[in-house]
From Swiss-Prot:
The gene is lpxB. It comes from Methylobacillus flagellatus (strain ATCC 51484 / DSM 6875 / VKM B-1610 / KT). Its EC number is 2.4.1.182. This is Lipid-A-disaccharide synthase. Pfam families: LpxB. The keyword Thylakoid does not apply.
Length: 378
């Protein structure tokens, strides 16, 4: 039975991995998948050696704190694949974990595919040599990435983004509100503080205080907070009580981020894949992020681009506002959101750009990615 080694490190990678496994099994039902998988990949038949949550660490300080455990897991996973050699290994995102693992496997003659280029165009250009040593084939989600790899002599395929295939070109706000039993004429704000516990801890207080300020200006406002785990939900609920927000019209949802954003007039979102989902749902948004100050100082020194949010990177300009770190305060966040919603020409510009983006990224991603992987299997 042909075996594919596969490692994902967080929720967005789990989603990508689950769709890729499904596409591969359509063409080769005999394939076996083993590595580190999240719940969606496991549901598609992947076997996991460790819980994926163990890899979900972000920020330099946080990684240092968890480093011994991460190194131990990586060593054990590498040894497993050397003892049970897969036909090909796929690393999904998680570059700091996967590139070292991929380099070890590639040096032992195991082909390696990396799915999702790291942000070398933003702050990791020095990593291209490490990528050359580690990766047999790169699967790039964004159209500006392949040229960087071709110039460095790395085999690459532009596959587009699976979210662009999954999401309809025109969202249905009215239908989403009917399903969620929300008034059609209310202001609805979706708030997405991230998928990791550390992200939600950093942003929960900010989002709740911002919701209070928005409500003081717009008493008809409703707030939707989709969270994917019990742990992140508990963190947000504790923050609600700590900020005396128990009377706020906030609905905490288990997942259903797409539905929440479709029902919303606007989105407040942590920097990450959810910003792209909001763009593909054509929603005006404010991108936020907070991290421990030391991590922020290190990140600032490494950054090449003036923006961090994927919609702005793809647009090549600040199509939506970013309020990061010390700028991420309730007064600014509430005022910026209300001002944006009052400017119809700004919203029209945002939505036009997001439609263009959607068309560019819609590439039948799963099939293209599967084809590239299967080229390594006899």
């Amino acid at each position: 039975m042909p075996t594919i080694g596969i490692v994902a490190g967080e929720a967005s990678g789990d989603l990508l991995g689950s769709h890729l496994i499904r596409a591969l099994k359509k063409q080769r039902p005999d394939l076996k998948f083993v590595g580190i998988a999240g719940p969606k990949m496991i549901a598609e038949g992947a076997e996991t050696l460790f819980p994926m949550e163990r890899l979900s660490v972000r920020g330099y300080v946080e990684v240092l704190r968890h480093l011994p455990g991460l190194l131990k897991i990586r060593k054990e996973v590498a040894q497993y694949f050397l003892d049970h050699r897969p036909d090909v290994f796929i690393g999904i995102d998680a570059p700091d974990f996967n590139f070292t693992l991929e380099r070890k496997l590639k040096h032992q003659g195991i082909p390696t595919v990396h799915y999702v280029s790291p942000s070398i165009w933003a702050w990791r250009r020095g990593k291209i040599k490490k990528i050359q040593q580690a990766v047999s084939h790169m699967l790039a989600l964004f159209p500006f990435e392949p040229e960087i790899y071709r110039q460095a002599g790395v085999a690459v395929s532009y596959v587009g983004h699976p979210l662009a295939d999954m999401l309809p070109m025109e969202p249905d706000m009215e239908g989403a509100r009917e399903e969620l039993k929300l008034p059609q004429d209310s202001l609805v704000v979706a708030m997405l503080p991230g998928s990791r516990q550390s992200e939600v801890q950093q942003l929960a207080d900010l989002y709740i205080k911002t919701a209070k300020l928005i409500l003081s200006e717009r008493p008809d406002a409703r707030f939707l907070v989709p969270l994917i785990t019990r742990e992140t939900r508990a963190i947000f609920e504790r923050a609600l009580y700590a900020n005396e927000g128990y009377d706020l019209p906030v609905s905490i949802m288990f997942g259903h981020a797409h539905q929440a954003m479709e029902a919303a007039n606007a989105v407040i979102v942590a920097s990450g894949t959810a910003t792209l989902e909001a763009a593909l749902i054509k929603r005006p948004m404010i991108i936020t992020y907070r991290m421990p100050n030391l991590s922020w100082q290190i990140l600032k020194r490494m950054k090449y681009l003036p923006y961090v949010g994927l919609p702005n990177v793809l647009a090549g300009r600040f199509i939506v506002p970013e309020l990061l770190q010390h700028d991420a305060v309730p007064d600014k966040l509430a005022a910026t959101l209300l001002q944006m919603l009052s400017d119809k020409s700004q919203i029209a510009d945002i939505q036009t750009e997001f439609r263009r983006m959607h068309e560019l990224l819609r590439q039948n991603t799963e099939e293209k990615a599967a084809r590239a992987v299967l080229s390594f299997i006899k």
